[in-house]
Design a protein with these regions (language model features):
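HIT superfamily nucleotide-processing domains
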Residues: 1-140
Length: 140
């Protein structure tokens, strides 16, 4: 895939909308448009890497440090019972967007994990409201 058609590259370059909750010089964290639960966050490198096989070690470590921080914040803000962190590599693993990303998903007791494609899109208003709550915690 050429980077010009990558939706996550477009989000990183502000050419597509996203409800951003965290940003630094290397990564961006924003709410998934098809959330498994409210607060479902994606963390991406700003630079295009297709999957974990391509990303430099220092960058993947940074992405996961932000993933840990995001998991703590999402759990606190949503009141979730737990957090699932998912990172898929390749079509066979379920990767749908071929730009490295990790999912930080709030989970509740007794809940099963559906396929991401079976989840309806959330409204931009819902995403922005949750993004504001999470952004506030990142500033603390």
């Amino acid at each position: 895939m050429d980077n010009n058609s990558c939706i996550f590259c477009k989000i990183a370059q502000r050419q597509a909308q996203a409800s951003i909750i965290y940003e630094d010089d290397k990564v961006l964290a924003f709410l998934d448009i098809r959330p498994l639960n409210e607060g479902h966050t994606l963390i991406i490198p700003k630079e295009h890497y297709e999957n974990v096989y391509d990303v430099p070690d220092d960058l993947i470590a940074h992405i996961h440090r932000i993933g840990k921080r995001t998991a703590i914040i999402v759990k606190n803000v949503t009141g979730a019972d737990g957090i699932t962190i998912i990172q898929q590599n390749g079509h066979a693993a379920g990767q749908e967007v071929f730009h490295l990303h990790i999912h930080v998903v709030p989970r509740y007791e007794g809940q099963k994990l559906p396929k991401f494609t079976d989840i309806p899109n959330a409204s931009r208003e819902q995403l922005n409201e949750m993004a504001e709550r999470l952004k506030t915690e990142f500033k603390n």
